[in-house]
Amino acid sequence: MQNQRIRIR
């Protein structure tokens, strides 16, 4: 899950 890092703000 690479997108999870970018999705979390």
From Swiss-Prot:
Superkingdom of source: Bacteria
GO CC term (a single one): ribosome
Keywords for this protein: Ribonucleoprotein, Ribosomal protein
Function per UniProt: Involved in the binding of tRNA to the ribosomes.
Subunit: Part of the 30S ribosomal subunit.
Family: Belongs to the universal ribosomal protein uS10 family.
Protein name: Small ribosomal subunit protein uS10
Native species: Serratia marcescens
